[in-house]
């Protein structure tokens, strides 16, 4: 793991790959190995009590990464690499693309005399502006702005693990007076097992069908981006969408103190927290295909099972201060076609009051966030019936949370 991280850092920095030199010590019946890694001209020695050669190389790479991370931001090799290669701008662009937002917009202002200009740049992402340090060139000023934006966003990063899924990134985003919980996670547990079984089934036709479906999805996303959100302005569409969840998440509870810390506010423990059912509104994305009801039913059962297991691990106690209620995947696993009568019965989903569908997401129509906010008191099981469900949680105990 550490060797891979060190190698990735070398590739991003356009340096030569790390080289390892190992020595063997001790008697033949109990050998000990020690490794030395050379990275960008610097040598780092690992411990000498490793029992295998592989363990010694990983230990040396771990020592190198630890020493590089302890250096100051101005002299850190990692910071220099990220700054010089423009990785911060790439990270912001990838974040906006994965979240379904508009790409970051950079605004640069030139000041000072002509022979010694000074450039100051600001970047706008998801309705929030971040200003970077002044620089002598426009390119460097934009890098500074991207670095400031990424550092500010990383301060709200909360990493947690909830079986059967591993949450790669959990953000508390304050936007428009509301608090949105955004979860990016890698598929695991039941969802990952089903996907692995589909990959290893040996059915060539099924894999080809999956490729065609993926290509069609990319085409729909391009068409949707060209149309500017399907009939509304691009600015309004990006403001409504905030951040979009691509992968799978389970029902989980998040303390108000954690959300308040992410929002930059202190939490008053004396004030009672509102109930999760009264503070949650849903955005329902119905599918156009007739099989969506059957698929979503399977996803609902899997999510409910994961939620019960998570509640059992917490001793049956539910924290209603801030509740991120069941974010579903873009497309649930495929199942056989059910009879039309069963499909019609499963497609009877209560619609949020005043829920228009002004624009479409990739292949799916999406209700607006404002209309879904009117559906107070609805259970998540009533909203999760078909397609994609994104649930917004408003934390009333945090008065006017400031953007992060």
Swiss-Prot record:
GO terms for molecular function: double-stranded RNA binding. It comes from the Eukaryota. Residues 263-280 have a biased composition (Low complexity). It holds the Pfam family dsrm. InterPro entries: AtDRB-like_DSRM_1 (IPR044450), AtDRB-like_DSRM_2 (IPR044451), dsRBD_dom (IPR014720). Residues 195-236, 263-320, 336-362 are annotated as: Disordered. Residues 302-316 have a biased composition (Basic residues). Residues 1-70, 87-155 form the DRBM domain. PROSITE patterns: DS_RBD (PS50137). Keywords: Repeat, RNA-binding. Binds double-stranded RNA. PANTHER family: DOUBLE-STRANDED RNA-BINDING PROTEIN 2 (PTHR46031:SF26), PTHR46031. This is Double-stranded RNA-binding protein 5. It comes from Oryza sativa subsp. japonica (Rice). The gene is DRB5.
